[in-house]
A protein has these predicted regions:
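Short coil/turn motifs at helix boundaries and re-entrant loops, enriched in small/polar
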Residues: 8-14, 80-95, 99, 130-133
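Extracellular/lumenal glycan-associated surfaces
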Residues: 9, 23, 139
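Short loop segments at secondary-structure junctions
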Residues: 15-17, 61-63, 71, 128-130
Length: 155
């Protein structure tokens, strides 16, 4: 049974989200949801690491484009991870899908950290041969996206 069958977005790490939004809009006519800036805690190798990310998604879909940028040294640092970065998929069972992808050879890179230091919300994995990351997003986060897509803030 295929695990990642509900594609949501294609993630691109850029140096400047607003500048990239403008360039892509001028070239393609795509439009964007409001720019978001989040402080978040990631779980990396069992350690909680605080960072930030700035991002936006296209209005048009069905598979949207995400542009993201973050501080130097982060997973959204253009100098380290710039360009096509990941494919994002909704998941009904984040932990089971992580385990299944790991059983297939994928490496868990990081994910959202819960208050108790566990993994929650989303996770990034990388297959051993492609270099293109897989982001699993828990469907429990869908209301946050729906609120943002309806014109509110993310969350």
């Amino acid at each position: 049974m295929a695990l990642i069958t509900d594609p949501f977005h294609t993630g691109i790490v850029v140096a400047d989200v607003e500048e990239s939004m403008a360039h892509i809009s001028a070239a393609s006519g795509l439009t964007w949801h409001s720019l978001q800036s989040l402080d978040l805690d990631l779980l990396i190798d069992g350690e909680v690491v605080s960072t930030s990310v700035q991002f936006s998604y296209t209005v048009e879909g069905p598979v949207q484009i995400e542009l993201a940028a973050g501080p130097k040294g982060s997973f959204w640092d253009f100098d380290l991870y710039g360009g096509l970065n990941h494919m994002g998929y909704w998941t009904e069972d984040l932990h089971a899908d992580i385990a299944a992808l790991q059983a297939g050879g994928c490496e868990l890179i990081y994910g959202g950290a819960s208050e108790d230091g566990g993994l929650q919300g989303f996770a990034f994995l990388i297959p051993p041969t492609t270099g293109l990351r897989i982001e699993l997003i828990d469907v429990a986060m869908r209301p946050a996206f729906d609120n943002w897509f309806a014109g509110g803030e993310f969350g």
